A protein has these predicted regions:
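Short capping loops/turns at secondary-structure boundaries
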Residues: 17-20, 40, 62-66, 88-92
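Long recognition/docking surfaces used for binding and targeting
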Residues: 1-53
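Short hydrophobic/aromatic-rich motifs at helix boundaries and adjacent loops
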Residues: 19, 41-46, 57, 69, ...
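Conserved S-adenosyl-L-methionine
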Residues: 65-207
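Class I SAM-dependent transferase core
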Residues: 43-68, 74-76
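Generic secondary-structure boundary/loop-capping signal
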Residues: 33, 60-61, 200
Length: 207
């Protein structure tokens, strides 16, 4: 994990997990019945936020904005795809995550509408009159189009719509290095967008 996120400076080389063997075994026994690899980013993110709330709440006078308040403000702001979103005092990244998810949902809805439109075009009455071989060819072409659309939702594809949202539109800073790292990890757990989060006092007068 340290090597994978080395460029993001999430962990120091000296960081170690300090846990007793008995505690580790108890955690494994409790969690081994769940397949987290098949769990959605939303579920992982909610679980991580629950952990954050219990661990950091009130630490150094910092409190987290309730998710209902975040959702309300994001809905009022109504961020659009391609717009730059910045939180100069991002804390655990709640507002950045809310904005990321809001725009991501719009992208997903748009792509789903595009899929329906394309499928309707390919599955018209004309399709029913094709020979079996011609239908197979049409199905193959349809699958290629859908596969290309799916790359738009890959956050690692920097040229895709979700990739551009993750790498070009989401930015945040926090004066507390621990909170900056926490915001990065929180965004990773919610499906990414962490690359624009940095340790910096965003409220300083740089002029």
């Amino acid at each position: 994990t340290k090597d994978y996120y080395k460029d993001d400076e999430l962990f120091d080389d000296s960081d170690k997990i300090k846990i007793k063997q008995a505690s580790f075994e108890a955690i494994v026994e409790e969690l081994e019945k769940y397949n987290l690899s098949d769990t959605s980013d939303d579920v992982k993110g909610i679980a991580f936020e629950e952990f954050l709330g219990r661990t950091f709440r009130g630490d150094l006078g910092q409190f987290f904005t309730p998710r209902t308040v975040v959702d309300f403000i994001i809905k009022v702001l109504d961020p659009q795809e391609g717009e730059t979103i910045c939180d100069p005092a991002c804390g655990s990244g709640g507002f950045l995550i809310g904005a990321f998810e809001y725009v991501r949902n719009k992208i997903e809805e748009d792509l789903q509408a595009e899929r329906v439109k394309i499928r309707k075009k390919y599955k018209s009455e004309y399709y029913e009159n094709l020979s079996k071989k011609e239908q197979e060819k049409a199905d193959e072409e349809l699958n290629k189009i859908f596969s290309k659309l799916n790359t738009e939702l890959d956050s690692k594809n920097k040229n895709g719509r979700l990739g551009k949202l993750s790498f070009d539109c989401i930015f945040g800073t926090d004066a507390n290095p621990r909170m900056a790292r926490t915001a990065k990890m929180n965004m990773i757990m919610h499906g990414d967008g962490h690359g624009g989060v940095h340790h910096h006092d965003g409220l300083l007068n740089v002029n």
